[in-house]
Amino acid sequence: MPALSGPQYLGEGLKLIMRPGLRLFVLIPLTLNLLVFALLIGFAMQQFSHWVDLLMPSLPDWLSFLQYIVWPLFVLLVLVIVFFTFTMVANIISAPFNGFLSEKVEVVVRGRDDFPPFSWAELLAMIPRTMGREMRKLAYFLPRALVLLVLSFVPGVNLIATPLWILFGIWMMAVQYIDYPADNHKLGWNEMLAWLRSKRWACMGFGGMTYLALLIPLVNLVMMPAAVAGATLFWVREEGEKALVK
C-alpha cells in the first residue's frame, strides 16, 4: 500500500469509521467522549477568566498597553491546557474501545473484512493491557507538561510557553493515537517511540492535523475515533510491523 502524507491519514481515517462494520466500535467511545466533554467544558466555562488572570503576568502601569497584546496569547494558553486535559481524560476512559477499534480498522485496511461477532469478553480482556499503556503515556506526558506549566508562570519566558505547548501537543497526538495499533501488535513503548522518531515529519503532519481537528468543539468528538482509524492506517502504510522485527 502506498504511504500518504501525514495530514491525509486523518481524512482517510474519517472515511474508514463511516463503514457499517465499524460503527458500533465508534459509537461506544463517542458516547463516553461526549459525557467527558460536557462535564469538562461546563467546568472550564466557570473557571476560564480566573485561569487567564492567574497566568497573565503583572505589568507596571507604563506597560499596561501590552496587556491587550499578550492577553490573547494567554487565552490561547488556557485553551491549549483545557484541550490537553480533555484529550488525556477522554483517551484514558476510552482506551479499551480505541484499541478494539484500531484492531477492527486494521482488519478492514488489510483487506479482510470478515469481522467476528462482537464479544464483550474480548473487549474486557483488553482493559488491563490498554489501561497500563495509557498510564505509560501519562508517565511520559506529565513530567514534560509540568516543565511547560512551570514555564507558563515565569515572566518573560511564559511568552514562549504557548508555541512550546503546541509543538509538544502535536507530537503527543502522534504518540497517543499511533500507539493503539503499535500496542495491539505488542510493540514495546521505547521501540514505539524510536519508530515514531524515524518517521518524525510524517508523525508531525498527522499529529498537527489531528491537533487542529481536536481543537474544534463537538467536531473533536468525531475526530477522536477518526484519529484512531487514521493512526492505524499510518501503522499499516508506513510499515510499522517492520519495527517488530528489529
UniProtKB/Swiss-Prot annotation:
Transit peptide recorded as keyword: no
TM segment ranges: 24-44, 69-89, 148-168, 214-234
Cellular localisation: Cell inner membrane
Main location: membrane
InterPro entries membership: CysZ_sulfate_transptr, Sulfate_CysZ
S-S bonds: none
Keywords, comma-separated and alphabetical: Amino-acid biosynthesis, Cell inner membrane, Cell membrane, Cysteine biosynthesis, Membrane, Sulfate transport, Transmembrane, Transmembrane helix, Transport
Any one annotated GO CC term: plasma membrane
Membrane-topology descriptor: Multi-pass membrane protein
GO terms under biological process: cysteine biosynthetic process; sulfate assimilation
Pfam families found in the cross-reference section: EI24
Single GO MF annotation: high-affinity sulfate:proton symporter activity
Family: Belongs to the CysZ family.
Name of the protein this chain belongs to: Sulfate transporter CysZ
Native organism taxonomy: Bacteria, Pseudomonadati, Pseudomonadota, Gammaproteobacteria, Pseudomonadales
